[in-house]
């Protein structure tokens, strides 16, 4: 059976342009939107392993921790209230991403980023001053609203601002910011946990104000994308901005294509309903399946619950937080590898290599934990070398994710949608991501209690399934201009039956013909 298709040669446009300091600055600032998501992932798992935090808000979990070593280690964190604390954010992000789609389309990408920063800042302040569990959950819900807006707008912003030759690397800046946010949070957790008096968790949770202010202030100074400006009728300003972004005077070909795509977009009255049309079947499939599979790698439970997990396998609180810092450092370093390789090696290669690496590591970790913990979850005293082996393979697993499904799970969906469905489709991507992050966060601690080490084998099974899916159905998108992506689907062995020549890209043909007519006239 043929694998994914590749588009090369004749039909492909090459818009003029270079990587200017201006576009680099705007993409770096916009990518900082990932800090708020990453900081939350890193900070929450850390504070839930701090005894003072658990004693104040989740006393039943704290009491389980204080029991002797005969306690089933798999089940010591199984608490409905603790689960609600962690997972409420993702449900809120799901709801806000649906609203953010309309805001992003009608008012621009920048305004959505601004809303995201403000809402996240409010949630961080409530959590930092929380005195009751309900305050923690309200704060988490506001954090989720902020993340929903930011995750909707930032990947679109980066894909639209970046020159097509550098789109992969610049878009992965979002994932790099997520990993940096995770690492910073884990380092802060390690030091704040040592504060006498047991109030360090307040600094950890309240510290989320800093990344929130970065994206809030950043969104005030950033320009909107030419695509978004054209979509809102600001043609002259968009052309001027496009010249500055690309660093060349002749942007007529790209501009005409953007205008043509915008005209087709404006002819669509119901973008949500339009997503169900046959010609958008490949886009809708990827918008759903890529974020679905991204969460079923198990990465968020590893990063989110890393301190809890390391505590479970025999580390002290300090050692578990430090081990989480190590995995966070690996996460950042491996994401840099992805930035280097995504526009050289392609998306498919990284997806498949990362999947293979994660599969091997999950099998090894399951075997190691199963051999020592058995099914009753009472390992006794773990040798230091044994714990180091487990952490090493978890780090290799994190690296495999960080240069594959981590960044590409945001990059590929954001670059494959035509303008007329782009905002709605990106909202689907964010919503699916948050739905399954919520579900997995909701059931992870219970699954760990019941499936024990077999939980890692469940995630390993899904890694096999998703790798097969990528091999068969995902075409290579490296080096294709964002408004020319229709070629990818028309050339694919399977998706070509849904996306026919006469059915897709008519607006771009109009733009091409308009550009040629203008050239002849001159």
Swiss-Prot record:
GO terms, molecular function: monosaccharide transmembrane transporter activity; symporter activity
GO cellular component: extracellular region; plant-type vacuole; plasma membrane; plasmodesma
Single biological process term from Gene Ontology: monosaccharide transmembrane transport
Residues modified to Phosphoserine: 252
Tissue: Mostly expressed in young leaves, especially in guard cells (at protein level). Also present in roots.
Subcellular location: Cell membrane
Keyword Aminoacyl-tRNA synthetase in annotation: no
Membrane among keywords: yes
Cleaved signal peptide residues: none
Residue spans, topological domain Extracellular: 44-79, 139-140, 193-202, 311-321, 370-384, 449-452
UniProt cross-references to Pfam families, sorted A to Z: Sugar_tr
Principal location class: membrane
UniProt-listed PROSITE patterns: MFS (PS50850), SUGAR_TRANSPORT_1 (PS00216), SUGAR_TRANSPORT_2 (PS00217)
Induction: Strong increase at the onset of the dark period followed by a progressive decrease. Transient increase at midday.
Cross-referenced SUPFAM superfamilies: MFS general substrate transporter
Membrane topology note: Multi-pass membrane protein
Keywords: Cell membrane, Membrane, Phosphoprotein, Sugar transport, Symport, Transmembrane, Transmembrane helix, Transport
Coiled coil: none
Residues passing through the membrane, by range: 23-43, 80-100, 118-138, 141-161, 172-192, 203-223, 290-310, 322-342, 349-369, 385-405, 428-448, 453-473
Residues in the Cytoplasmic compartment per record: 1-22, 101-117, 162-171, 224-289, 343-348, 406-427, 474-522
NCBIfam families tied to this protein: SP (TIGR00879)
Record's function text: Major hexose transporter. Mediates an active uptake of hexoses, by sugar/hydrogen symport. Can transport glucose, 3-O-methylglucose, fructose, xylose, mannose, galactose, fucose, 2-deoxyglucose and arabinose. Confers sensitivity to galactose in seedlings.
Entry's family note: Belongs to the major facilitator superfamily. Sugar transporter (TC 2.A.1.1) family.
PANTHER family: SOLUTE CARRIER FAMILY 2, FACILITATED GLUCOSE TRANSPORTER (PTHR23500), SUGAR TRANSPORT PROTEIN 1 (PTHR23500:SF574)
Name this polypeptide is given: Sugar transport protein 1
Designated gene of the protein: STP1
